A protein has these predicted regions:
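Glycine-rich phosphate-binding loop of actin/hexokinase-like ATP-binding domains
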Residues: 114-119, 123-178, 182, 260-265, ...
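ATP-dependent carbohydrate kinase catalytic cores
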Residues: 93-122, 206-221, 226
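Short beta-strand-loop/turn "lid" adjacent to the catalytic site in phosphate-handling enzymes
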Residues: 50-95, 103-113, 129, 250-253
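Glycine-rich phosphate-binding loop signature in dinucleotide/nucleotide-binding domains
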Residues: 50-53, 89, 121-124, 235-236
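Short acidic-glycine loop/turn motifs at beta-strand connectors
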Residues: 21-24, 68, 142-146
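Active-site nucleophile and cofactor-binding loops and adjacent substrate-binding regions
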Residues: 34-36, 74-75, 94-101, 119-123, ...
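Short glycine-aspartate micro-motif
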Residues: 5-9, 54-58, 94, 127-131, ...
Length: 301
């Protein structure tokens, strides 16, 4: 019997594991684990496999991958592809960024796993995945013949765009936790908590007219709009932007409001280009595993 391959989606909070047979994810094999319940990824893998032999490993990890190894950004876990292969007896093991894995999944997702938010005017070409969860990152998805090419990125740790219309004092509040003011300081679960804490201090006088939750949402939408607008012109994703992650799903009902669409499309002579970019939300929590299966198919002779 042919050995299955191990697929891994290692996030900052949870890890999903699954098996692929014949190059496709077996949905019945998927299990989710809380990272806090395990001392490290090795113990988690051993608990899942229970000695079962596997052929190969593809893991999407929430952190930068360098020389086949990764230090996760939001949990003190270190992964090394060679060590994973030795641990499991796999012939080969590969680490990619978790947003790369999401990008590799785009052509293999069932239609019901995505919902359109802004229709735009999509044209076949570059696509973009924007992840908003425990952290923040993007992946640009390019077609190369019948294959996909998804380069790594750590865009969530680039600096927030210039936004002079943000409430006075907010940037100073954010800088206390993250002096380099990365995008992730706002557009992530912890970032939302930071905004809510600042709103709760009551120093935002115009915001006192709003419910704290409404004010927090408005500020977050405003930042997201500027970031999405900049990404639209940086990458020209003519085939659209796909949002993923828990924070993205929470904000999705608000993304047709002018508080989001106006700043996102306010790009001067390039407003029409920004307005043509479609936006959709992905609901499938197994997408990264599907993408890991696609990645293995592409690199396996």
């Amino acid at each position: 019997m042919t050995k299955p391959s191990l697929l891994m989606d290692i996030g900052g909070t949870n890890t999903r594991l699954g098996l692929s047979h014949g190059g496709a994810l077996d949905p019945a094999s998927v299990q989710i684990f809380r990272n806090a319940d395990h001392p490290g990824p090795e113990a988690l893998i051993e608990s899942y496999l229970k000695g079962r032999p596997i052929a190969a490993i593809a893991a999407g990890v929430a952190g930068p991958v360098q020389a086949g190894a990764a230090q996760l950004t939001n949990i003190d876990w270190y992964l090394d592809a060679a060590n994973l292969a030795r641990l499991t007896g796999a012939r080969t093991a590969h680490l990619i960024n978790d947003l790369q894995a999401q990008g590799y999944a785009l052509d293999d997702l069932p239609p019901e796993s995505v919902t359109e938010i802004l229709p735009g005017r999509p044209v076949r070409g570059t696509r973009l995945v924007l992840g908003l969860g425990t952290g923040c990152n993007i992946a640009a998805v390019y077609r190369a013949g019948a294959q996909l090419f998804v380069p790594p990125s750590e865009t969530g740790h680039t600096r927030l765009p210039h936004m002079p219309d943000l409430p006075e004092g907010l940037m100073e509040h954010l800088a206390r936790a993250a002096p380099h003011l990365p995008i992730e300081a706002v557009l992530s679960g912890p970032g939302l908590t930071r905004i809510a804490a600042w709103v709760g201090e009551g120093t935002d006088l115009p915001g006192l007219l709003l419910d704290p939750e409404q004010r927090t949402t408005r500020i977050t939408l405003h930042v997201l709009a500027h970031v999405v607008g900049d990404l639209a012109l940086t990458h020209l994703p003519t085939e659209g932007i796909t949002l993923i992650g828990g924070l993205a799903r929470a904000l999705a009902p608000h993304l047709t409001r002018p508080e989001f669409t106006e700043p996102a499309q306010a790009k001067g002579p390039y407003r029409a280009i920004a307005a043509a970019i479609s936006l959709r939300i992905l609901h499938d929590d197994t997408a990264a595993l599907i993408g890991c299966a696609r990645y293995l198919r592409q690199i396996t002779p």
